[in-house]
Swiss-Prot record:
Keyword annotations from UniProtKB, A to Z: Coiled coil, Cytoplasm, Phosphoprotein
Molecular function GO terms recorded: phosphatidylinositol binding; phosphatidylinositol-3-phosphate binding
Post-translational modification Phosphoserine, affected residues: S670, S673, S692
Family: Belongs to the sorting nexin family.
GO cellular component: cell periphery; cytoplasm; fungal-type vacuole; intracellular membrane-bounded organelle; nucleus-vacuole junction
Function comment: Essential for mitotic growth. Mediates organelle inheritance.
Annotated InterPro entries: Phox_assoc, PX_dom, PX_dom_sf, Sorting_nexin_C
Source species: Saccharomyces cerevisiae (strain ATCC 204508 / S288c) (Baker's yeast)
Descriptive protein name: Structural protein MDM1
Span of domain PXA: 85-273
Main location group: cytoplasm
Cellular compartments annotated: Cytoplasm
UniProt domain PX: residue ranges: 782-905
Misc: Present with 784 molecules/cell in log phase SD medium.
Amino acid sequence: MPKFPQFRLILVLFYLISMIQWSVITFSLGFFLNVCIFAYFVFFKSLPDLPKPQPRFVDIVPESSNTVDVDKELKSVEGLIQDGNAQIGKELESIVNLIIKDFVQPWFTKIDKNSDAEFLKVIKWRLLQTLLVVKDKLMKNDSASLIVLKLLPIFNKHFSTFCDAREAVLSDLTLERHKSANIDLQIAVEFNKNYKIHKSLSLKPNALQKEIEKSIRKTVIGLLPHLFDNDELDSLLVFTLMTEVLTTCIISPLIFKFTDPDSWNLRIVSLSQNYFEEKHKVHKIRRMLSKELQDHRKVMNDVANKDVGEPSSEKLELNAEYTGKQFEHYLNQLDSLLDLSDIKYVAYSLALKIYQLKENEHLTKENLKYKKRLLLSLNLIESKLSFPGSEIDTASKKLAREANYPDLNMDNGIVLKEMASFLTSITLKDIVDDSEFLPFFESFLGSVPETQGSTFLEYSQTIESFKNPLEDATSEDIISGYSGISTMQLQEISSKFFHNNNLQNMKLLDEGLVKNIILFRNSFQINNDEDTFILARKSVLLLQTEAIKYLDDRFLPLFKKTPSFLKMLSTSHIISTDIYAHFLSRIGGVNNPEQNKIIKDNVKTDFMNPVRIFANPGITDALDNIVNGSGSKPHKSRISSNPRYSQLFGSENDNIFKDKLFDDENDNTSEISVVEDQLDHPRNMEKVSVSSGNSGLNPSQFYGSNNFRDNIASLTISIDQIEKELELLRHLILKADLTNNQMQLKILKKSQRTLLKELEMKELLKQQYMVQENGNSLFRKTKIYIRSYFSENSSNGLKEITYYIINIHHFNNGQVSSWDMARRYNEFFELNTYLKKNFRDLMRQLQDLFPSKVKMSLKYHVTKTLLYEERKQKLEKYLRELLSISEICEDNIFRRFLTDPTPFKLNKEYMHDDILEEPLHEPIGSSNSTSNSSSVVDLQSSEDGGELNFYEDERHFFTDSGYPFYSQNKSFVKQICDLFISLFALNKANAGWLRGRAIITVLQQLLGSTIEKYIKVSIQKLRSEDQVFEAIVTFKNMLWGDNGLFERKRNETAEATRSEGERLRTEQLALTSLQRLFADTCGRVVGLRDSHEAAGRVHAMLQNPYLNASLLLEALDAILLDIICND
């Protein structure tokens, strides 16, 4: 091969000669030829071969099976995603499969048509891993703080700025400009001057969606390092694919949907319709329950004439194969049971079958349904055994308060508890002494690998068959009766049980006793000695005792865990045994005529009998009619503006409740007409709307001692009535869940929540009355905590007023009630002055605890925040010290300070006794006052012990152990109040009486609980598995459902787009629906006009797509920063 330098020189010379001598064509051909030759030698002979190019996405698929087993990893992550709740895991996996189907397979099938390709498995694996990361971060996130402390201020500022911008634009536009101008864009521009829209939006025409998607893509790019490993993101395809999937498949569709005003309008209309339909159905259900209670005498005429018959020879049995009709017939048979022995046998049989199913951890769908039927039937039977004052009766009342009826997790039932104790109490002697039960135990011993069990049982029975009943192996005086027969028996026992394998088993009991018997056997032929015989016989009896103990300690517990044990107790022979008699004694004693008479009397008088109500076909038909919407709907003029109460108990003349404290207005129509007459006078209107609930109570007599007792008595009757209704409703919910009637279940649960809310409010009001009426109601029964304060400007705007929010927790009769009280520093100061005047000696030790007033010389040199924080801590400590002094706790004025939400002001001319005679004013809204802002928590403890633990356990309310919603030192009151003020424009000069402490009171009326508790508990409910599952299903249907976003895109050619006229009609309908919704929920406390105006402002804000996009993107940034990128 020639040397390259010489060759290159020849080429250069040749090239120069060609340039000079050849023609243009010859030159071109020569040049091309020379270049080809030059390239061949230089590049292909002197440089190494380049590798063949590969697509970069192959890097995410393992090159060999040694790197990672994709199938194994995928199976593992699928198991982790379903850990905790299989339903949620399956829905998430289904969404991942849909993402791959819609966004990966369409282009990947052009490379590989195999639907089971390893690349698709890797993508699924990575997406599921991402969901696990998100799940872990969500579990660690404080959702309440995120929503209230971060998202709520964003929305509040956005809403306030929008209202100002809208007012400025509309006041500036003339009529001509108004017709042609883009109002939404004008408002967005004005909004941008004051608050700045999201940085990614430019407000350019027709660029909104592109800018939204660009912003989301940029956000996702910053998000990926928190969801994936860096090694995975090094692959360009992984990075690009994950970015596009998260952007175009998950986040962008949601933002686009809620940016469109028409989507909001449709959702508002749907929400409003569903709300009022459900509210109407709830009212009808309450009327139906009330009617059943009122008409019980007529319904029970036939039942009252029944005579208690003899015990039925045919026992009722519920089989797993029963159809729905057969199960209904079985329930009717349960209702007809009047003999106590029959009732108790059914209770025994049902409880035993439930325990049989509990042994199986993985029940089939059929067995799960069967278990629910068994639980329901047992619950109904317990109601028939519930005599007044009995343990079952007390437990039933307590269970009626609980809100988790549909779970059917009723292992706390009295019969089930007694059954568990009964099964534990069954002894080996009970089984061995019964010829019907013994074969089950023998069969079990024969099935286990250890042979000593069968040997010991046979040995014990053999000894029992020949020993004298009076013989005692532990006594020195053994009645042996020396004879040839006894000697032969010992010889037979020795030859049968003390040879070969049996000998080894017997040595496990006592090797020394075994040696005594072997010694007797060996010496029997040689020396027939009586002493040796007695020793052997005593050893035989002692070994029997050891054998029984061995069986009892080792084999009986194992036998009780097998299906054979429960099968043994399920035989028909059981009712004639001592074991069954022992069970009957546990659940109320043996059958007797007196208890049968009680059963019959209960049938006649107990119109709340849930068995009868449950089996009543009339109630079933009525529920079907209510749920299916049959029957007339209420006229608009008759719809009360109060969402909680409105003729819920039938006719006005029925007088189910005798107390007028809780009556809604006698005529809702007249109430609405009065309120509507005040539309032109907003201040009067608000006063009417709040005080209208007080018509049944004379304020001047509110604090009379006799009136307190009357109110407490009326409340007791009302609470008892509600508890009975809850008991009935509980069985209806169980039946709806059992029959899988989801429509009934939904409306019944809503009715249950309404009843529970009303029950809590009345119980709280009862406790507040008891605090006012009883001088011993505070000491060692009350705790307080000042978590926050709330400031606002006075009505004239000259000074700032601060209210300290006192959280009060009161213990009474095993229950803890909590409410909030807003007090100014001046009110604390007036209380302190009063107490120092009337309790001089007691207050001397507390004079240094009360925070002093700020001196005028220091007024402008003290930071307000530090001042308020210091006062908050000192006032809390001061109140706690007051509650530790019994004499002060007995003072009426001090009790009023903690229970009456009206301004606390005393006439300083009066002394202690005279002040007590001063009539106090009724709290705002009476039954809708702060008492409605309560929560009642059952401590499930005895009164004395519970009160002692409540008082001494300082951690009960101030740590996670008692109230998890008070776990962090963060207050939500200010954010909620600010939002309420912005929503209803209460910061204006004409806001009227609704300021300061009234805002706190009104908010608690609307929320039905203390503010912070309501927020925490509501968010905890949203984080529950049921709510999470429902949200995931809704998200899935929104994008991939029959009418989902992607499905509509596929069929957009066939789908008719909504016309401008349809959109306008929906917009107007949404406005009226939202106004009606606001008026119904808030009209009674803020007035109809303010409710309508607030609804109009919210509706107008949702009609601006630019600001919708800005708000959603800002909220998205805050959510991702707090949840995903917080590390």
